C-alpha cells in the first residue's frame, strides 16, 4: 500500500536510489497504490552523474510492496521492501537492468518489458 509521501527503493539502474510518491495515478479516489500501479514521484536520493537527479519528478511503476497482496487464487504475497521501477510516461522502463524480484501481477497490467528485464518473477 503506497500513498503520497511514501518512500520507495528504486529497483533499476537509472541512478536514482530512493523516491517519494507524490500521487497514485488512476482516478481521483485512487488513494493507495499496490503492485503494478503507476505513480508520480520525486527523486530523493540519487547517484552523482546519473540520468536522473535529486528533485526530478518522474513516473514509476510499483514492483514490490511490504503490505501483503491477495491474489485471485487466494494466496498472499509480500516482499521485504517497497520498490518501484522508473518508467517513461508511455510505460517503458528508463533503465536497462532491474534488480530483485518483481510480482507476477505486472504481466496482467501489460508491463512485459519490466517482466523480461527482471531476474525473478514471483
UniProtKB/Swiss-Prot annotation:
CDD domains: Ribosomal_uL14. GO terms for cellular component: cytosolic large ribosomal subunit. InterPro entries: Ribosomal_uL14 (IPR000218), Ribosomal_uL14_bac-type (IPR005745), Ribosomal_uL14_CS (IPR019972), Ribosomal_uL14_sf (IPR036853). SUPFAM superfamilies: Ribosomal protein L14. Keywords: Ribonucleoprotein, Ribosomal protein, RNA-binding, rRNA-binding. It comes from the Bacteria. GO terms for biological process: translation. The keyword Oxidoreductase does not apply. Part of the 50S ribosomal subunit. Forms a cluster with proteins L3 and L19. In the 70S ribosome, L14 and L19 interact and together make contacts with the 16S rRNA in bridges B5 and B8. This is Large ribosomal subunit protein uL14. It comes from Thermomicrobium roseum (strain ATCC 27502 / DSM 5159 / P-2). The lineage of its organism: Bacteria, Pseudomonadati, Thermomicrobiota, Thermomicrobia, Thermomicrobiales.
